[in-house]
Amino acid sequence: GASKRGWTTWSIAAVDKRIVAIVPIVIDMLNVVPSFKHHYRAYGFYAPAVGDYVEMGIMGWQDTPEYKRLLEIVEPYEYLERYTMPKYLINASGDQFFLPDSWKFYYKNLLGQKHLRYVPNAGHSLDGSDAVYSLAAYYNAILNKTKLPEYDWDVQEDGSIKVTTKVRPKEVLL
């Protein structure tokens, strides 16, 4: 599911054992409070895309006990131990709601097989992008039980990305 339906993707995966894999799309906000605090610090304001939430005062609730209690129920990050199924997160590099480094608030804490893609030159709608092809490829791999690449990556102090693989790749395309 995409956007709000991406949130639903996380939510249903936390409670339904029939789910074999998930692909939340353009919902790059697990661990929502640090993510949105980072959003504000990066821009110095909340992006117009989240204006309705700002107008309703929701951003001002983030440090309240009531908001914390609400997140204990509805925040997918609260259920990390349940997301043991394969996960493919598809996000947009130019998302109007979420920053392209929001992964740093949750990705390393996800359990099991996980893959993350930021679709280049795409906004929240992913219009005009090739995202559907990577979704279809992942779907096909899950259905056919195709072994997917196993790797880990870390952003280094100098900004470079170090990738470690289980099997030496024959080729790497950037």
Please describe what each predicted stretch is:
Residues Y83, L89-N91:
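Short beta-strand/loop motif that positions the catalytic acidic residue
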Residues I19-V20, Q113-K114, P169:
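Core-facing hydrophobic residues within beta-strands of well-ordered domains
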Residues D130, A136-L173:
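Surface beta-strand/loop "capping" patches
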Residues G1-A13:
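Glycine-rich nucleophile elbow surrounding the catalytic serine of serine-hydrolase chemistry
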Residues S11-G60, R117-P120, S125-D130:
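Hydrolase active-site cap/lid region
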Residues M29, Q62-Y79:
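Active-site nucleophile elbow and catalytic-triad environment of alpha/beta-hydrolase enzymes
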Residues L99-Y107:
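Short alpha-helix in the alpha/beta-hydrolase fold that links the catalytic acid
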Residues G94-F98, H124-S125:
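Acidic catalytic loop of the alpha/beta-hydrolase fold
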